[in-house]
Amino acid sequence: MRVSRLMLVTLRDVPAEAEITSHQLLLRGGFIRRVGSGIYAYLPMMWKVLQRITTIIREEMNRAGALETLLPQLHPSELWQRSGRWQGYTAGEGIMFHLEDRQGRELGLGPTHEEVITSLAGELLRSYRQLPVNLYQVQTKFRDEIRPRFGLMRGREFIMKDAYSFHADEADLQATYAVMDQAYRRIFERCGLEAVPVDADSGAIGGAASQEFMVTAEAGEDLILISDDGAYAANQEKAVSIPDAVASLPPAALTLLKTPGQTTIEGLCTAQAWQPGQLVKVLLLLAQLEDGQQQPVLVSLRGDQDLNEVKLVNAVSRRSEQGVLDCRPISPDDLQRQGINTIPFGFIGPDLADKVLADASSWTTSFLRLADTTATELEQFHCGANAEDQHRSHCSWGDLGGAPQGEDLRKARAGERCVHNPDARLQEKRGIEVGHIFQLGRKYSQALDCCFTNENGRDEPFWMGCYGIGVSRLAQAAVEQHHDDGGIRWPAAIAPYEVIVVIANNHDDAQTDLGDTVYATLLEAGIDVLLDDRKERAGVKFKDADLIGIPWRLVIGRDAAEGTVELVQRSNREMRKLPHGEAIGELLKALRP
């Protein structure tokens, strides 16, 4: 391809909309163009990158025994209502675009395909003899993100590879899950990415075991915690650790203290000379449940710990035996709208009585009470007294009628000891999620009543797995992990072109003739090569070559008459002057070993 025919439009200035380096470089390099909020056009070079990534994915999925298919993007609402996810995905802050057809039937634009594929499996896979089956597709997905940002990292339209496997039993599911784990590791390695597999929460997809693949990068939205012995890694949403120990309070009688204006942990500790880890703080939240209930939640937590919102939502879901659409802090304005005026924020204790909710106009009138283990393990502690400007000192759970059941609701933090090895410590890194694999179990097959006949002649729901890769996100993650001050440094396996031939001076016949010769030779050898034949200054061409990040640059310059060229490797900027035939040989050795 000649650059003069490529529709290459590069930008010198950083677009104001682009917050992170990879987004800036993809816009500046002419790879993508913004069409609307969270909506991007993939321009010719970007499309080549995406095709190269997709080719690697297809090869590894096929190697793993998966079958490629293509599923509809329009989903009848009935399927999602049967699985119980329609309201969660369309109401409030739900992420599914939905519409009505001219007959008034509700449809959703697919953000994921569990319902559709499970329904099809139930119709087509009737016997255990047909199992296991693993189906995958590469397709555009749609999600109505509340805050689209970072270019392709969090868009409203994106390309994804999603796969779904069906099994007769859990052991077979686990075997395929292990095969897919290895396939994913090979995919990311072949794409030239350092991707860390981490334990993860299953989120709205649901299921039992789940693992994310994170590309480590400073701009990553996810915080991952990795043990310094290399044996454990988890997304902070899922991570567990041993919290730092705190000094126990010396035994003493319960005391009621006046604490005017001391509504924060910091304020209390300063005024009373207390340690944060010796307090039990109480958080009030409101959970919106799938059946429409608005459930007040009271959470007790040790004063030096932070609440993990994902663990909280999972705990509420387990206790209520249904999905949670939203869970947010209760504010004084919320209380006023409910007609409740009796809750003293800043002075709440773990034993706040349910009667304070008696006048609530639309909330459930009793608290769902949860407590983190760090709080329940304290023998004595300081806490609120449920009265304005008052706290209790040297309180025990016995004073409050007994300790609630403790569970892990806290955020694990860097520097804390590891559960698997107390001698190891957690370290913190930022990551970009590029892949996620799940053991779904029977969640969807049971909800949709999709069964096969087992070897005993009885109907049984499928065991299912789900495996996703964000294809367009992976491309941008590669840029985030591989760039320098000059621009992108594409890994060779996914670069839009393997070599760029730059003619420094198009007015020099020796340079243009040699450039055409080298270009033709590389094409004949099967190299995907770009020829910069523009009538631009050499400096402009060199800057553009650095910006778009082609792995190898072959410069035809002032030594063209002698047949000498410059061979430059983009990853390390190493330059060698070589006879053009030798330079071509070096390229073939590197690219076609």
Curated annotation (Swiss-Prot):
State the Gene Ontology BP annotations: prolyl-tRNA aminoacylation
The UniProt catalytic activity note for this protein reads: tRNA(Pro) + L-proline + ATP = L-prolyl-tRNA(Pro) + AMP + diphosphate
* Pfam entry (one): tRNA_edit
Q: Where does it localize? A: Cytoplasm
The alphabetical list of record keywords is:
Aminoacyl-tRNA synthetase, ATP-binding, Cytoplasm, Ligase, Nucleotide-binding, Protein biosynthesis
What InterPro entries does its record include? aa-tRNA-synt_IIb, aa-tRNA-synth_II, aa-tRNA-synth_II/BPL/LPL, Anticodon-bd, Anticodon-bd_dom_sf, Pro-tRNA-ligase_IIa, Pro-tRNA-synth_IIa_bac-type, Pro-tRNA-Synthase_IIa_type1
Entry GO MF terms: aminoacyl-tRNA deacylase activity; ATP binding; proline-tRNA ligase activity
Principal cellular location given in the protein's record: cytoplasm
**Cellular component, GO, one term:** cytosol
Q: What is its EC number?
A: 6.1.1.15
State the coiled-coil residue ranges. none
The similarity comment for this entry is: Belongs to the class-II aminoacyl-tRNA synthetase family. ProS type 1 subfamily.
Assembly, per entry: Homodimer.
Q: What does this protein do?
A: Catalyzes the attachment of proline to tRNA(Pro) in a two-step reaction: proline is first activated by ATP to form Pro-AMP and then transferred to the acceptor end of tRNA(Pro). As ProRS can inadvertently accommodate and process non-cognate amino acids such as alanine and cysteine, to avoid such errors it has two additional distinct editing activities against alanine. One activity is designated as 'pretransfer' editing and involves the tRNA(Pro)-independent hydrolysis of activated Ala-AMP.
Comment field on protein domains = Consists of three domains: the N-terminal catalytic domain, the editing domain and the C-terminal anticodon-binding domain.
Report what the protein is called.
Proline--tRNA ligase
